[in-house]
Amino acid sequence: MIYLPDTNVWSRYLRGRDEDLPLRARVEAALADCRLSAIALMELEYGAEKSPHVPAFRLRITRLKEIVPAVAPFGTVAAYHAGFVRAWLARLKPNAQPIGPYDALLAGHALSLGAVFVTGNTAEFSRVPGLAVEDWRAAVGRKLRE
């Protein structure tokens, strides 16, 4: 099984605060099956650059890239899925509520990989058709949708 953690998961993992220890343990237990989305990496890079502590954040991102088995590139299949997700949630679904552009990219990326999307933002991503979503903030991951 492949897991594609959301940017918020990687951010909390890198932060390493006490309240993030259960999440950190869960990520580390599944690290061999985790992929770092190129989209999530871009969001982490952006956060580092706008931080007042650029060198410290940069070091954390470098370490993350060293321990995650692969950075998953965003290709044409992911682009197709992301476009579908954004359009479907914006106008095709009854009572449409659009999804943010980066969230659409991440959801499309997970769909293209056949990955379980790991996020703390389950309300947003559980609306995506066909996307398996898990929340690892608790000590034991909670499967929300397949």
Model-derived features: positions:
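Active-site neighborhoods of divalent-metal-dependent phosphate/nucleic-acid chemistry enzymes
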Residues: 70-116, 144
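Acidic, PIN/NYN-like endoribonuclease modules and their adjacent C-terminal/linker elements
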Residues: 1, 107, 111-146
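Conserved beta-strand segments of alpha/beta enzyme cores
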Residues: 33, 69-70, 116, 132
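Alpha-helix capping/helix-boundary segments
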Residues: 9, 40, 78, 106, ...
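Short, structured coil segments at secondary-structure junctions
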Residues: 30, 67, 128-129
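Generic structural signal for small/hydrophobic residues in well-ordered secondary structure
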Residues: 6-7, 44, 82, 110, ...
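Short, well-structured N-terminal submotif of metal-dependent ribonuclease cores
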Residues: 1-37, 48-63, 142-145
